[in-house]
Amino acid sequence: MKFIVLLLIVTSVLMMFAVTTEASPQVNHKIERAKCGQKGKCYDGVNVQCIDCNTG
């Protein structure tokens, strides 16, 4: 019985870790997009850089 509980705890911690690492690139994209917006440019998510809006 203790083994099952331990297994559940380990998997839930791993899931939480996976979710947080999954979310951080999204946050980075938002930050980068905001930086590009301040320069009057558009954000290219594929190449992760600021580009002129009309070229995209």
Swiss-Prot record:
Molecular function GO terms recorded: toxin activity
Tissue: Expressed by the venom apparatus.
Record family assignment: Belongs to the caterpillar 2 family.
Signal peptide range in chain numbering: 1-25
UniProt keyword annotations, A-Z: Amidation, Disulfide bond, Pyrrolidone carboxylic acid, Secreted, Signal, Toxin
PTM-bearing positions, type Pyrrolidone carboxylic acid: 26
Protein name: U-megalopygitoxin(2)-Mo9
Superkingdom in the source lineage: Eukaryota
Its job: Probable toxin.
One GO term describing the cellular component: extracellular region
